[in-house]
Curated annotation (Swiss-Prot):
It is found in: Cytoplasm; Nucleus. This is Proteasome subunit alpha type-4. SUPFAM superfamilies: N-terminal nucleophile aminohydrolases (Ntn hydrolases). CDD domains: proteasome_alpha_type_4. Disulfide bonds: none annotated. Keywords: Cytoplasm, Nucleus, Proteasome. One of its GO terms (cellular component) is proteasome core complex, alpha-subunit complex. Belongs to the peptidase T1A family. The proteasome is a multicatalytic proteinase complex which is characterized by its ability to cleave peptides with Arg, Phe, Tyr, Leu, and Glu adjacent to the leaving group at neutral or slightly basic pH. The proteasome has an ATP-dependent proteolytic activity. InterPro entries: Ntn_hydrolases_N, Proteasome_alpha, Proteasome_alpha-type, Proteasome_asu_N, Proteasome_bsu_CS, Proteasome_sua/b.
């Protein structure tokens, strides 16, 4: 019965469902996991890289983490070509705001603007939804550090800790148990690594399969976006007790 209603994005089924939007969300369920944690002194983003070839130029390529503006970054799960379009759109919106008002764009306003674009692709004929979910991490003078999650429908919400992608339920369950409101950035990194290990085969948890980024404030008050190097990731994995013997010899 559903096949009569799922060919177009603009037609509701008798149950009130938009099947193409639901299918887009299913595509994200097969993508590499991404986790975001809001700490009292920053925001931590971590993601599972699916492309781990030795031939890849890792120094110039990021699969999961992207900088949108000096004060906002995001982690991605889903179809990367769709994500690139939306990331570029967000960057342009942020620059236009800065040019017009001479100050950084508020984080939630940027997220809402991008989600309006995503929602439009669920409402007009001849278009398909963007098959990608985002975790946005940022800081502004209005609300301080913030973490938002958005899905293909254009819906978004603020979170203290959340996960998207494959096996995100396992990560969500661990975050519910272990997250504390006064968590520091250092402890948030350890919790993020621990939660991501639950979504992956823990024996394959190596720096080559991870991307870790942080958004925090420098003593000068400037927002800093930092992506960890493979060496830093290896050290963090060792400190967290997540590095397996097989990974150390590879």
């Amino acid at each position: 019965m559903s096949r009569r209603y799922d060919s177009r994005t603009t037609i509701f089924s008798p149950e009130g469902r938009l099947y193409q939007v639901e299918y887009a969300m299913e595509a994200i369920g097969n993508a590499g996991s991404a986790i975001g944690i809001l700490a009292k002194d920053g925001v931590v983003l971590i993601g599972e890289k699916k492309v781990t070839s030795k031939l890849l130029q890792t120094s110039t390529s990021t699969e999961k983490m992207y900088k949108i503006d000096d004060h906002v970054a995001c982690a991605v799960a889903g179809i990367m070509s769709d994500a690139n379009i939306l990331i570029n759109t967000a960057r342009v919106q942020a620059q236009r705001y800065t040019f017009s008002y001479q100050e950084p764009m508020p984080v939630e306003q940027l997220v809402q603007s991008l989600c309006d674009t995503k929602q439009g692709y669920t409402q007009f004929g001849g278009l398909r939804p963007f098959g990608v979910s985002f975790l946005f991490a940022g800081w502004d003078k209005n609300y301080g550090f913030q973490l938002y999650m958005s899905d293909p429908s254009g819906n978004y919400g603020g979170w203290k800790a959340t996960a998207i992608g494959a096996n995100n339920q396992a990560a969500q369950s661990m975050l519910k148990q272990d997250y504390k409101d006064d968590v520091t950035r250092e402890d948030a990194v350890k919790l993020a690594l621990k939660a991501l290990s639950k979504t992956m085969d823990s024996t394959s948890l190596t720096s080559e399969k991870l991307e870790l980024a942080e958004v925090y404030l420098l003593p000068s008050g400037k927002v800093k976006y930092q992506v960890h190097s493979p060496e830093s990731l290896n050290r963090l994995l060792t400190e967290s007790g997540l590095t397996q013997p097989a990974a150390e010899t590879s």
